[in-house]
Every structure is written in structure tokens, then in C-alpha cells.
Amino acid sequence: MVLDGVRKALSRFLSGKGDYERAVKEFIRDLQKELIKADVNVKLVLELTKKIRERALKEEPPPGITRREWFVNIVYEELSKFFGGDKKPDIKPKKKPWVMLLVGLQGSGKTTTAAKLAYYYKLEGYRVGLVAADTYRPAAYDQLKQLGEQIGVPVYGEPDNKDAVEIARRGVEYFVSRGFDIVIVDTAGRHHREEDLLREMREIAENIKPDEVVLVIDAAIGQQAHDLAKKFHEATPIGSIIVTKLDGTAKGGGALSAVAVTGATIKFIGTGEKIDELEVFRPPRFVARILGIGDLEGLIEKVRRIKVEFTEKDVEEFLSGRLNMRLVYKQLVSLRKMGPLRKILQMIPGLSLKIPLEIEAGKAEEKIKKWLAIINSMTYEELDKPEIIDRRRIRRIAYGAGVKPEDVRELLKQYEMMKKLSKQLRKRRDLLEKLQLGFKP
């Protein structure tokens, strides 16, 4: 995840018991190191940490909150402002049909992002069409066509036509005439200079009259995103930005902060290669995950959109420590549909600080299938009270599930770990409620 070191530094700060001012100084040094490593502009880093230091040493915490706890709130607020503030991007189309023109430099992940965007809006209930107007890159049409088939979204393209403007115009007309709600136009990303990119953007825009122009930026370019975002923001009043590949680069923080300082709107961020790994960018929620505070609202939203049997009540039960194997089974089935376990667990307040190493390494998904089989071999009594499972029961369960007794013991160990973690989260939830973080929309 972007800026993983910040979360670890904050964890050390909270667990420390020495001099407060010295601890603040050490955390700020760690924060500066992590931000600069993420290619954030040094001047911006120094301005940010100066504000945090001044507030940390001057402000008195409200009654009932320690200075270290209040410091978490200060860091949260200042980082949220740093990445764009608490304004929510307007992602709903203002009318139908709504035409979106995607532009971006070569290698920014634009075609994949077009499909992710189409999938996102399809899950929101819109009829979406994709237009393949990238006539420069070989197999661009085939790639978008394949992605469209994967997500059940139609794709318009003319593989033998090299006129991108004409294809874009015809594609928009095709979907609009058939009553589609949203039309997403993918274009070529062959330009390495901002001026060339913006010139072609204007040419296509003049012909298809888009309602929104979306600039796709690769997070790997770091603070270089500033100039591109600034010129784009000045060139079109209807523009928004998607920052991609945040999971695959250490420079994601630099790219996000560089765009935010221009005043341009970041609507979405790409957090992985899978088609559903595109999320609305809301700085407070993003920062909450960086700090290990979690993003319960984001988790519930993901559950709602994917329509899994994993409710807000289930999340609350886990966080309250009321756990049994029935709930574990339900969670495992749901989590399989929601993507990598590590990313889901990072959304649970406080849990990202204590994610088991095997989940960090991405190996847990391989074991879920085996764990489900083990749970299916348990009796009703064992499901409700896993604590009664002894050596004899372990052998019986393993035989019924077709696994080794060690596999059953491993699941029971994970269950105990989850119970322990959920109890530890109670204290952190109390802190979050005091600070009014993490659980407010």
C-alpha cells in the first residue's frame, strides 16, 4: 500500500511511553522520510510537517483524550488536507446520456481504466458502452473488446479505420441512438509531451462534445504529475483525473499530492490489476487507511456494490468480539468475492497494523478453499463454540474435510488470532469514537 511506513511509524508513536515532544520529533522525521521516498515535493513535505509540529506542541487535547491520541487526529486532519481535503468528488452523471473522453500518456493504463470505469458504473445500474478509438497501439481494440466481454459491456470499434476522431464520433452516435446512459471513449496514449496530448484531446472533444474529459495518470511518474495535471486543469473546465497503479509504485503519494496542489479533481484511484480495483478517491478515507485507522465506510460500500452476504451487522459483530465459526465461514465466502484479503483487512479500523504475515504475502487466498471445507465438516455445536474442539474432534473434522489435522489446527489458530484482534480493536474503536474518525461518512 502507498506510504506503508507512515502506518508503522504511527504505531510506534502510539505504543511509546517516553517524552512526548521527542516522540513527535521522531514521528515527523519518519513521516518526512516516507513522503520524500514516495517522491513528494520536498518543499510540500516541509510545509506539511511544520504544520503538524506546530499543532502538536501548541494544541491541548479535549478532556478524556491523551496528547498522543490527539496527535493522531492532528496527523489525520493535516494529511487529509494535503491530499485534497474532505470534498467528495461528484461521480454521478448529471444527465443521460453522459459522454466521457479518456486521455492519457502512453503506458498510463488507460484502456484497462476505461473498462474498470465501465464496470464501476455498470454495478451502479447504468447502461454503459465503450468506444475503442485508440488507432495507434496494435491490438488496442482487441484488448478493450476482451475486457468488455469479461464485464458484459458492449464495445464499439472499427479495427480497419485509422481515423480516431471519426471512430469516436460514430461510436458515441451508436450508443446514444440506442439509449445508453454512459459512453466511455478510449483514445491513444502515444504522446510523451503534454502539448501534443492536449492538442489531440481538444480535436476529439470538438467532434464528440464530451460531458467530461478524464485524464489518466500513472502513479509511477510521482511529482511529475504536477505539470501534466496543471496544464490539463487549465485546458478544460470539465476535467477530472484518475490516478492508476497505486499498488505497484512507491511514488503514489508523490503523484496524488502533486495533482492535489493544482486544484484538479481526482475522482478515482486504481488500486490493483483486477477489474473491480477502482475506487472513488476521498482523501480522509485514503489517509485513514494509511494511518491504520481503517475505512469502514469504504468496506460497507464495497460490500453493497458487489452484493455479497456480508452486512454492516457482520462487520460490527466482528469488531465487537462476538465471533464463531458461522460468522467466519460467512466472512470467508464474502471475502473471496471482494478481492485480496490484505486490502479488505486494511479497511477495518486498526487491523491493518496487525495483519498476519501470510496475508501480507498474499498467500491466504489459497487457503480459504481448504478452510471452508474444514468448517463444513464441523457440527452445529462446534460451529457455535469452536473452543470445544479437542484432539479427537480435530481428527474427525480433518477426515471429513479431506485435509490433514495440522490444517484444522491452523484454522483454529487463525480463529483465536481473529478473536484476539477483535478484542484489541475495542480500545481503538473507543479512541476513534472520541476523535470522531473512521466511522463518520
From Swiss-Prot:
Q: Which GO terms describe its cellular component?
A: signal recognition particle
- Please classify the protein's predominant subcellular localization into one broad category: cytoplasm
InterPro entries according to UniProt = AAA+_ATPase (IPR003593), P-loop_NTPase (IPR027417), Signal_recog_part_SRP54_M_sf (IPR036891), Signal_recog_particl_SRP54_hlx (IPR013822), Signal_recog_particle_SRP54_M (IPR004125), SRP/SRP_N (IPR036225), SRP54 (IPR022941), SRP54_GTPase_dom (IPR000897)
Q: Which organism is it from?
A: Staphylothermus marinus (strain ATCC 43588 / DSM 3639 / JCM 9404 / F1)
Q: Which UniProt keywords apply?
A: Cytoplasm, GTP-binding, Hydrolase, Nucleotide-binding, Ribonucleoprotein, RNA-binding, Signal recognition particle
Describe the task this protein carries out.
Involved in targeting and insertion of nascent membrane proteins into the cytoplasmic membrane. Binds to the hydrophobic signal sequence of the ribosome-nascent chain (RNC) as it emerges from the ribosomes. The SRP-RNC complex is then targeted to the cytoplasmic membrane where it interacts with the SRP receptor FtsY.
- HAMAP family annotated for this entry? SRP54
Q: Which residues bind GTP?
A: 104-111, 186-190, 244-247
Reactions that this protein is recorded to catalyse: GTP + H2O = GDP + phosphate + H(+)
Q: What is its EC number?
A: 3.6.5.4
The keyword Hydrolase appears for this protein: yes
Cite the record's note on assembly: Part of the signal recognition particle protein translocation system, which is composed of SRP and FtsY. Archaeal SRP consists of a 7S RNA molecule of 300 nucleotides and two protein subunits: SRP54 and SRP19.
Q: Provide the family line.
A: Belongs to the GTP-binding SRP family. SRP54 subfamily.
Specify the protein name. Answer: Signal recognition particle 54 kDa protein
**How are the domains described in the entry?**
Composed of three domains: the N-terminal N domain, which is responsible for interactions with the ribosome, the central G domain, which binds GTP, and the C-terminal M domain, which binds the RNA and the signal sequence of the RNC.
The reply to whether Cytoplasm figures as a keyword in the UniProt entry is yes
Compartment(s) of residence: Cytoplasm
Please name the GO terms of the biological process aspect recorded for this protein, alphabetically. SRP-dependent cotranslational protein targeting to membrane
Give GO terms: molecular function aspect only: 7S RNA binding; ATP hydrolysis activity; GTP binding; GTPase activity
Q: Which gene encodes it?
A: srp54
